[in-house]
Each structure stands twice: as C-alpha cells, then as structure tokens.
A protein has these predicted regions:
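Bateman/CBS regulatory modules and CBS-like beta-alpha motifs in cytosolic regions of diverse proteins
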Residues: 23, 28-51, 80-119, 124-126, ...
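Glycine-rich phosphate-binding active-site loops on the catalytic face of alpha/beta enzymes
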Residues: 65-80, 239-251, 290-308, 337-353
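Active-site-adjacent beta->alpha loops and helix N-cap segments on the catalytic face
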Residues: 28-30, 76-86, 146, 189-208, ...
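Conserved active-site-proximal phosphate/metal-binding subdomains
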Residues: 4-9, 303-334, 338-353
C-alpha cells in the first residue's frame, strides 16, 4: 500500500481513509486468499478478543472452524482454561457440535438449550451416543413442557456417514429435504451434525488447524503475577497462541513478562500488546514477541481516550507499527476501531496480518 498524499499533516483513523481502485486480475471475491501471513496458521484474518463476555469455548470452536482464532481471557481459572482447550481440540473441524439429550429428558429441558445452536435442534441419543431422533421447537406444539422427548421427537433420521465431503452431505440434505442431519461413525455413534448452511460455508472457509489437524485456540496471559508459570502450563495444555496482554503494552513490566515467557516457551507463538508506535513495536519484538497488537482506545465501546487523553488514530498506528514489524521480520494485529466492514480492509491495507 502507498499513500497518494504521503506524509499527511495529521494522524489518520479509518474514517479518514479510502482505497483508490486500480487494475485487478481477481475475477471473484471467492478467489481472494485471506490466509494470514503471521505464521499462526489461521486462514481468516479475524481474532476474537480476549474479553470475558465474548471469547468462550463455543465461540472458539465456531470461529476456528471458519478459519479465525479466539483468545480466551486471562482472568479465567487455569483448570477451566484447560477444560476449554480440551473441548475445542476434540471438536470436529467441519461437523457442528449438537446439543444431545436422552429420551427421558423433557420438552422444557430441550427448549432451555435449543437456542444455543443456530440449527435449532436437539439430537436425542441412547446411552451409547447413537442417535434415536431429532427434536425441534415445532415438535413441542400441542404438548406441555413435562412431556418426554421420546414421545414427540422425529424418528425419521437420515444419518450421514463420517468422512462424507461437504458437497455430498449437501446433496443428501437436499434430496431428503432436511436442513440438518446427524453424522455417525462406523459404529453408529454420533460424531456431529451437518446443515445446509454449514456445508456451504465449509466449501468457502478453511478451518484453522494445528499440526495434528485439530481446531486452534489462543489464551491471554497478564503481565502481573507469574506469567512464565502460567504460559508454560498453557503450552502444555495445548494452547496454540499466547497473547501477553495489557492496555499499555509499552512498559518495562511488559518487557520483563515477555522475556520470561519466551524463556519458558521458546517455540510458542507469542503476541504482545497493546502499542501504537514504532518504538513500542521494536521493543516488544526485541523482548520476544512474534506479533505485536496495535491499538490504544480505538474501540467503539472503549473510553480510554476520553478518560485519559491517551491513544492514537488507528490507521496511522497500524501503518507505522506494521512498517516497523516488517522491517524486523514480524507482524502486527490491528486491535479495535472496526465499526464497518470497510475498516477490516483498511486495517489489512495498512499492514495488519
């Protein structure tokens, strides 16, 4: 990317910038490769922020299945983080994870959970995880909440064999006029479910997978306490990315935390931030960061700039930090300031990975 008017008098935010179109050989939006160059292994340049109300196991599973990465918050107990990592690593990279219940569960039980899945169904299974039927909200019409599922579920199942490719699965759903069907292994046990939308999306998006073909997940680490001890434990649990995170990343405590984490996890992919200057980027890289997180106060819900007077327009911050990171053979993530889809494209144009 280059600026048509180099050396602007003021720093720029996303609202100040437009991209000028030029000659392109890309015939379709589906021909655009969005795989990230930062070495993480994601195929989509989207990271779910390490916020308690945002990043959890379902978000991590779903986003990784589409090629992105979710970062678990730093304030979650370590044993819970371990269980979430284990859960995500056990999910199928293509098939969606259904809600399962036994035949003796009630309509009330099912209705309390059914909205946690976009496909709007519960798979009723026996003790051996073999599908017996499917329950949807429509099946509850005319029955009270205490009616057991075996009395109302649809037993007309068309199961999909494990290993079926997306196109074949879509054809099976279309032929049988179903929006969702269970996927079973050779022993008839439930592996997951396929949906029409899911099969279509899996032909467009590639999942973010680790070296063992499992979904990827990141975890945040604070700079206080014993970041090295926590980082070592997270790597042993299977975390693919460590994000050393604090609001003001250009400080000596961050640099010390980075150094000790790098010492105990020499091969880990480490992200650190947040900073908004080339100097901050350089010092984080020198301390051990592979990727630098850029942004102080650009978020739509963030009041950092208003309350403290600290920050920098995001487009200029990303551009400057990305240039410095590239000079050092590293990369940056643009953190915050995205209010419109265009802002993602502008962040990538500015140099974000």
């Amino acid at each position: 990317m280059r600026l048509l008017h180099p050396n602007p008098a003021h720093d720029l935010t996303y609202n100040d910038v437009f991209m000028v179109p030029s000659l392109s050989a890309v015939a379709s939006r589906l021909d655009v490769d969005l795989a990230t160059p930062d070495g993480i292994g994601t195929t989509l340049p989207v990271v779910v922020s390490n916020m308690t109300a945002v990043a959890g196991r379902r978000m991590a599973e779903t986003v990784a299945r589409r090629g992105g990465l979710a970062v678990l918050p730093q304030d979650i107990p370590l044993d819970v983080v371990g269980s979430v990592i284990e859960y995500v690593k056990q999910r199928h990279p293509i098939y969606e994870t259904p809600i399962t219940m036994s035949p003796s569960h009630t309509i009330g039980d099912a209705l309390g959970l059914i909205h946690k899945r976009a496909h709007g169904a519960v798979v009723v299974v026996d003790d051996g995880l073999r599908p017996l039927g499917v329950f949807t909200e429509h099946d509850a019409i005319g029955f009270d909440r205490f009616t057991q599922l075996h009395a109302v579920m649809s037993r007309e199942l068309v199961t999909v064999p494990d290993g079926t490719d997306a196109r074949t699965a879509f054809d099976l759903l279309s032929t049988n006029r179903r929006s969702m069907e269970p996927v079973v292994d050779g022993a008839g046990r439930l592996v997951g479910v396929v949906t029409r939308k899911g099969t279509l999306r899996s032909t467009t998006y590639r999942p973010a997978l680790d070296a063992d073909g499992r979904l990827m997940i990141g975890v945040a680490v604070g700079i206080n306490g014993d970041p090295d001890t926590k980082a070592k434990a997270l790597v042993e649990m299977g975390a693919d990315v460590l994000v050393i995170d604090t609001a003001h990343g250009h400080q000596t405590r961050m640099l010390r935390a980075l150094e000790v984490v790098r010492a105990v996890a020499p091969s880990a992919r480490i992200v650190a931030g947040n900073v908004v200057t080339a100097d901050g980027t350089r010092q984080l890289v020198d301390a051990g960061a592979d990727i630098v997180k850029v942004g102080v106060g650009p978020g739509a819900m963030c009041t950092t700039r208003m309350m403290t007077g600290v920050g920098r327009p995001q487009f200029t911050a990303v551009m400057e930090c990305a240039d410095e990171a590239a000079r050092l053979g590293k990369h940056v993530w643009a953190d915050g300031g995205v209010r419109w889809p265009r802002d993602v494209a502008l962040a990538l144009a500015a140099g974000a990975a």
